[in-house]
Curated annotation (Swiss-Prot):
UniProt enzyme class: ligase
Primary role: ATP-dependent carboxylate-amine ligase which exhibits weak glutamate--cysteine ligase activity.
PANTHER family tied to this protein: GLUTAMATE--CYSTEINE LIGASE 2-RELATED
InterPro entries hit by this protein: GCL_type2/YbdK_subfam (IPR050141), GCS2 (IPR006336), Gln_synth/guanido_kin_cat_dom (IPR014746), YbdK (IPR011793)
Species, as recorded: Cupriavidus pinatubonensis (strain JMP 134 / LMG 1197) (Cupriavidus necator (strain JMP 134))
Protein's recorded name: Putative glutamate--cysteine ligase 2
GO BP term (any one): modified amino acid biosynthetic process
Catalytic activity: L-cysteine + L-glutamate + ATP = gamma-L-glutamyl-L-cysteine + ADP + phosphate + H(+)
């Protein structure tokens, strides 16, 4: 299909999507409970959406179009509480986190939908290994061209988003040494990575048509980029975050992205350029591997500092934007997280060290999500 026209949306509105783990309460392994949970939730009144995902051991919740941090927090909290109430009668545990600590990918089932079955046929075992859990944030853009400016400008801050949300240190029972191992699964897909450096919608449309004519892609859904335009919504979609362990942290990160977007669109502190991507992969790796302790190389100044320090360095510039958006609490939470460097990956490792069993780690992660 041809590329859709870029739909009008209200600038700086946002939406949040969270992919969640469903586990049984016996051994806390992933379990295919999404159909049962969705049946139990049928008719429940809430904003946003609750829907199945690529595996029936996963479920996605998403807000509606939000203007404020508090609105997103209220919507996600309501859906969380509804799901917790329904899950108790079904003996289901629900958890955040970018990976399940000890699930075996070969045990996974692919959901019975045409798109997911197509992905399974095309990518083979990679589809089952894609049972990982991410947070996506959509940001409304004033125009198609502005969406591409914002996509590339905010790309400098991808290491911030990865490090702040990192919650996937374990894969198949092994401590990977990474703060966010989830993104290694995404990197296996051929259309992953970063979007091409194009700053006009006409140029992007021409690129899309060339790619479509090769037969490699059919729609924007076939691009697994870290940040991609979503013309049907009039947004860009930031896709690099693990699902945090709490609704509150997910909303803090979404609000941080919103205030960064406002800063970049209104203040124009720099113009994106191709050379911004010289250190993109290095910075992204540092965030995945070391989280907030990772190194950030500035693409123009060529200076090096911890990612946590780079986050703190931008926080002062974001104050007027956080005030305008009603997100001062979120900014304070982000600042505290960067100062203390006590992210979700660190929490999981500490619980695992104390509990000495990953089943107990998952149980406590379920309790943390429900709190």
């Amino acid at each position: 299909m041809s590329l859709e026209p870029f739909k009008h949306s209200e600038a700086l509105t946002f939406g949040v999507e969270l992919e969640l783990q469903l586990v049984n309460r016996h051994d806390y392994d992933l379990a295919p409970f999404a159909p049962d949970l969705l049946r139990a939730l049928k008719g429940a009144q809430h904003a946003g959406d609750i829907k199945p995902e690529i595996s029936p051991s996963m479920i996605e919740i998403s807000t509606g179009i939000c203007h404020t941090y508090q609105q997103a927090l209220d919507e996600l909290t309501t859906m969380r509480d509804l799901m917790q109430a329904a899950s108790r009668s079904l003996n289901i545990g629900i958890s955040g986190g970018g990976t399940h600590p000890f699930q075996q990918w070969a045990d996974r089932i692919i959901s019975d939908s045409p798109r997911y079955q197509y992905i399974s046929e095309l990518y083979g075992y990679l589809a089952k290994q894609f049972t990982v859990f991410g947070q996506h944030v959509h940001i409304g853009c004033p125009s198609a061209d502005e969406s591409l400016f914002l996509l590339h400008a905010i790309g400098r801050y991808v290491p911030h988003f990865v490090a702040l949300a990192a919650s996937s240190p374990y894969v198949q029972g092994v401590d990977t040494g990474f703060a966010s191992a989830r993104l290694n699964s995404v990197a296996a897909f051929p259309m992953s990575g970063r979007a091409p450096f194009l700053l006009t919608w006409d140029a992007f449309t021409a690129y899309f048509e060339k790619m479509r004519n090769t037969g490699v892609i059919e729609s924007m859904k076939d691009f697994y980029w870290d940040i991609r335009p979503k013309p049907e919504f009039g947004t860009i979609e930031v896709r690099v975050m693990d699902t945090p362990l709490t609704v509150e942290r997910a909303c803090d990160i979404a609000a941080y992205i919103q205030m960064l977007a406002r800063y970049l669109l209104l203040s124009r502190p720099f113009m994106p350029q191709e050379d911004d991507y010289l250190v993109y992969t290095f910075n992204r790796f540092q965030a995945c591997r070391f989280g907030l302790e990772g190194e950030y190389v500035h693409p123009n100044e060529l200076t090096r500092r911890p990612i946590a320090e780079h986050i703190l360095s931008i926080c002062d510039a974001l104050v007027p934007h956080a005030e305008a958006l009603g997100s001062m609490q979120a900014l304070a939470n982000i600042r505290a997280l960067a100062e203390n460097r006590n992210g979700d990956a660190e929490w999981l490792r500490q619980v695992d060290a104390d509990a000495r069993t990953q089943r107990e780690t998952v149980r406590q992660a379920c309790e943390r999500w429900a709190a």
